């Protein structure tokens, strides 16, 4: 390691877990490419965080060991927000609106970044869900698209310089 260099390289490394299915499944690969792009935009500003690393590692292992699920990346992003410090405040989740900008529920529509009705119901379904519960989530493709759009917007509102995710278009074409 040379602190004066911007680009570092590995001389040798050893894999802790050998992936078995992700590289053989185009849908899984598309999701991983999407998540890699999102993580590359986020982690560049992060300090060492072993819990975050463990979360990412466990999520990838889970995804590799289980069959494809079209909700994995959405649940991943919501749970990732816990480690980034802006997980939604689930107090008052009985309210009519969720304010994406401020991260809380409200009965007052006083922001340009409010979700409600079907979008809010879908959003509520994924809060508190872990990967083992993915099988219980059923959303239509339109609901899934809207939910992912809202989560990406949520990230843009909470992470400075979070730009558009280019691989999102590819992901949408896959499923």
Tell me what each language-model feature is.
Residues 1-175:
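Non-catalytic alpha-helical scaffolds and adjoining flexible linkers that form interface surfaces
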